[in-house]
Design a protein with these regions (language model features):
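Conserved beta-strand in the GNAT
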Residues: 109, 115-124, 136, 141
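A conserved beta-turn-beta hairpin within the catalytic core of GNAT-like acetyltransferases
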Residues: 125-137, 147
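Conserved acetyl-CoA-binding loop of GNAT-fold acetyltransferases
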Residues: 32-41, 184-194
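Conserved GNAT-fold acetyl-CoA-binding loop/helix
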Residues: 70, 74-97
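A short helix-loop-beta-strand connector motif used in the catalytic cores of GNAT acetyltransferases and
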Residues: 97-109, 136
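A short beta-loop-alpha structural element at the N-terminal edge
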Residues: 40, 59-74
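Conserved beta-strand-loop-alpha-helix junction that forms the acyl-donor binding cleft
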Residues: 18-28, 171-182, 196-200
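Conserved acyl-CoA
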Residues: 3-16, 143, 154-170
Length: 200
């Protein structure tokens, strides 16, 4: 029945087959047997599965145009789920949207056709060391089904070019030791010591 439905959807032009499995292990195992893989979360934080598309399609990167875009909320929750954090609340989503409107943070979105499959962000702050604005690179996330297809490189390049065009003195990223090699390969190749934080 599932195969028949998927074949019908494909015949009628569906580009993606995605579902919310509710975190139920039995459902997850069933859909995995059909070919689906776990793929982030929806805008409410519920876990999703996606049938990876068979056809190749180009991935492009663009600046986020709509601070209230539901696809950004979806990517943010996928990012939070992957790093073991709770889904974003409606209040936090509105705070983020307002920060985007105010120009405090800029998002870049990787798209495969109309679907947003990845993101990253730059937050601006003033540095007394540089006596000008610097940028912090964050929210770097690509949906599992679309990794190893060049989206990471495209996002990093777009962010680095934007930081140059907007006269940011530097663009820095804080990461876990296991991710150092990845960020160095993406052009973040200057080591600036360690980061320590006071968390309220």
């Amino acid at each position: 029945c599932a195969r028949t439905l998927l074949d019908w959807a494909k015949e009628h032009g569906a580009r993606y087959a995605e579902l919310n499995y509710g975190g139920n292990d039995w459902r997850r195992h069933f859909w995995e047997s059909v070919g689906f893989i776990e793929n982030g979360a929806d805008e409410w934080g519920e876990p999703l599965m996606l049938l990876p598309p068979e056809e190749d399609a180009p991935i492009t990167v663009e600046l986020l145009a709509d601070p209230d875009d539901w696809q950004l909320k979806k990517l943010e929750n996928g990012f939070l789920k992957e790093i073991g954090e709770a889904p974003s609340t409606e209040e936090k989503q509105e705070q983020l949207a307002q920060a985007i409107r105010d120009g405090k943070i800029t998002f870049f979105v990787a798209k495969r056709g109309y679907r947003a499959v990845g993101m990253c962000s730059i937050s601006r702050c003033f540095s007394t060391f540089a006596c000008t604005d610097v940028g912090i690179f964050d929210d770097f996330y690509i949906e599992p089904a679309f990794r190893k297809k060049g989206a990471a490189w495209l996002l990093a390049q777009a962010a680095q070019e934007w930081s140059k065009e907007n006269a940011l003195a530097s663009l820095t990223v804080t990461c876990a030791p296991c991710d150092e090699g990845m960020y160095q390969a993406l052009g973040f190749d200057t080591h600036l010591g360690n980061t320590f934080a006071y968390l309220r």
